Amino acid sequence: MASYDVLVIGAGPAGYVAAIRAAQLGNKVAIIDKEFLGGVCLNVGCIPSKALLKNAEVAHTLRTKGEEFGFSFSNLKLDYASAVKRSRQVSDRLVKGVDYLMKKNKIDVHMGTAMLTAKDTVSVKPKKGEAVGHKAKNIIIATGASPLSVPGVEPDGEQVLTYWPAILQETLPKSVIIVGGGAIGLEFATVWSSYGSQVTLVEMLDRIAPLEDEEVSKELAKAMTKDGITVKTGTKLEKVEKTKTKVKVSVSGKGGQETLEAEQVLLAIGFRPNTKDLGLEQLGVKLGRRGEILIDDRMATNVPGIWAIGDVTAKLMLAHVGSAMGIVCAENIAGVETIRLDYSMMPRATYCHPQVASFGLTEAQAKEAGYEVKVSRFNFQANGKALGLADYAGWVKLITDSRYGEILGAHMIGPEVTELLPELTIAQMAELTAAEISRNVHAHPSLTEVLMEVAHVAEGHAIHI
């Protein structure tokens, strides 16, 4: 039985980052995962999906703007299988990188299913062989989350999919019904529609991207409809029936009930924390209503020596948030200076077309919180770089408090907006105002100029509108 200072269960972006930081701080560290290093994100989530989305961007450009760009072809061939193969190469490269980082930081890697048998002991059952116990002064749980199920609908990996088989399949569906208008549903809708699939997006709430600012949701629905995607909001999934060649989906909405048909259905309705069969209840670890592990600001559970980070805590199910939690957790274990994470100000990014990015309060949330809200906007149509890219739909919306100029949030839709967030989030964290952003000289021409421009708008001296 090996003994460690820190033992991490789960090797995704939260877990492996926590393991690295703990090792940097002088701890003897091990990490456990039942599937693979890098977790869902690197293997079947964030990373391969971004590779597919880049292929989709090129395909979309060739299909919709080829003539504008001066490309002439009589028979454009789009090979989806090649796109998937490229996404696997990107994923494999990064997973090998994580493996290297484990070796570099002298972190022991144990592959198998973990269970806590005591507050300082973890049993690891490999796919072959007997379970092995490991002792640890500190145990960090970073087991992630799994797709929510729909009552009466059983995914089979062929006709009814979740994200995992969907991202691995090399055959492009001729038609697909995507249930769920959040990030995963939106990104798959972009990929498949760009390659020519007939896509229907079904969302139970009254708008897609329901966690975003309402204006962003409306703009995105308009753009996706223009791209040939059928968007059905306020529509509930009732029943799924499979035949040999297609899937029939019964839905209900404002217009009553209807039956949709497609080759495949993708279920993308959210996630539940992976806390089952970990032995948490026996140790008295407190769980929340959704099964999430309850933690304090230090990432500590109610049981001394047991910590939790990432999606399993359901704080904010985003890979970068999990990584930040991992660093803070490792630093708290080591007793060194660290920070307190403000989950309300975390960056959020969706890589559909057009891209969506945001942080902080929406306009409605800011008003509800009692701020004297000032809304400033700048359109990409007035940005030279966006025009040069022939991708200028969308805008940036900045939310500030008119009394002090405090930055409360920002909401963006348009080209590469996911890359524009850090300037605003660090400004908010450093308590800068729109005045400082407006006076920060930005390279020209660049998409980042929209941030300077919207700050000028907020300050009452708009330049290019």
What are these regions (language model features)?
Residues 9-11, 17, 23-35, 40, ...:
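Flexible, glycine-rich terminal cap/loop adjacent to redox cofactors
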Residues 46, 143-198, 202, 281-283, ...:
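Glycine-rich dinucleotide-binding loop and its adjacent helix/turn
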Residues 156-172, 259-335:
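FAD-site-proximal beta/loop scaffold in flavoenzymes
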Residues 1-12, 172-182:
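Beta1/beta-strand and adjacent pyrophosphate-binding region of the FAD-binding site
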Residues 7-9, 114, 134-144, 178-179, ...:
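Short hydrophobic core segments
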Residues 108-110, 115-127, 195-297, 361, ...:
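A Rossmann-like FAD-binding core segment of flavoenzymes
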Residues 2-4, 20-27, 32-172, 200, ...:
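Glycine-rich flavin
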Residues 10-15, 144, 180-185, 270, ...:
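Conserved phosphate-binding and hydrolysis motifs of nucleotide-dependent enzymes
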